[in-house]
Amino acid sequence: MLNNHQKHAKGGRFNRWSGNLWLTIDFSEKSYNTLLTVGNTLPSRQYYYKEGITYSASGRGGYAFRYLPKNHVFDVGGSSMFLIREDVKLMYVLAFLNSSLGFYIADSLNPTANIQVGDLKKVPFVLPDEDTQNEVGQYAQQNVDLTNSLLKYKPNEPIFENTAIEEYNNNKSWIDILHSFIQDYIGIKALILNNEAIINNKIFKIFDLSEQDKTLVVKKQGIKIGNEPVTKQAATAFIDKFNNQLLNGTIEHIFYIYIYIIHGTTTLPLKIKNWNTTSDHCVKICSIIISND
C-alpha cells in the first residue's frame, strides 16, 4: 500500500541545494523487518524522518549538498548528516558545505570523486555567533527556495506542480511561452550564482583566511561566477544577443533549450520531422518528452 512507502534520499545526479528526492521505499512491517536483517541493517534508523542535509558521495559534477526535509529515510547512496547541537543553524552548515572553502577542504582530505562520512568528520568547522549564522544561512535558504521554484516544473520531482508550458500559458503562442520560461529560468539561476558568491565571501571572512589562503582556494576551485566583474557594456551586449537568439532563433533551437532545462539532455525520445507545427501539437510533444524524464 502507498502509505507503507516512505520518501527515500538516494543521491543521484549533481544537484546542489535541493532535489533528488524522487524515490520511495517499502517500509511496511514485513519489509522493515527484512531490512533489519539484510544489507546494512539500517544502522542509522534513529535519524530517519529528521531534518538534515543529504549529499551525493560521488558524481561527475563533484560533491553536492542539499537540504533534506523532514519525513525522509536515506541510505549510503544519499548519505545524510544531522545537527546534534541546538546552537548550530542548519542553513549555515549547508552554506559552508556548498562553499568553495568547504569543497577545497573536502578535496584536500579525499582527492577522489567519492567523499566518505569519515572525511566530513575531519573537516574543520568555525561556528560564528547566531546573527552571523542567520546572515549566511539566509542565502542558503534562498537558494533552496529558488532551486525548488525550478524543480516544481519537473514531473519526476515530488514537489511537481505544473509543466512550464501550462504555467506560463496566458493565451500566448507556445514559442512566447518558452521565451518567458527560459528568461525566468536564467534569471533564477543568476540569483543562485550570486548568492553562492556572497556565501563564499562571507565564509572566507568567518574563517579569517589570508589573501594567500584565498588565492590557494580560488586557484583550485575556481572563482565563483557571481564574483566576476561585468561592465555595463558587456552586460548590455549579452542581454541584446540573448534576446536576439530567443526572438530570432528557429523553432527547433528554442525547443531544444527548453528540453535541455527540463529533461537535462538534448537527446530526445522521439524524432520531430515538422517543426512548423501547431501550438497544440507542440505542447503535446513537450508533455510526452518531459514525462519520459
Question: Which residue stretches match the model-derived regions?
Answer:
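Noncatalytic linker/hinge segments flanking ATPase motor cores
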Residues: 50, 97, 120-123, 163-168
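Residues that form generic nucleotide/phosphate-binding pockets
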Residues: 8, 96, 104, 108, ...
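Amphipathic, alpha-helical segments enriched in basic
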Residues: 2, 30, 49, 56, ...
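Non-catalytic, well-ordered alpha-helical scaffold segments
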Residues: 3, 52, 90-95, 201
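Polyanion-binding catalytic cores of nucleic-acid enzymes and NTP/SAM-utilizing transferases
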Residues: 1-83, 141, 149, 185, ...
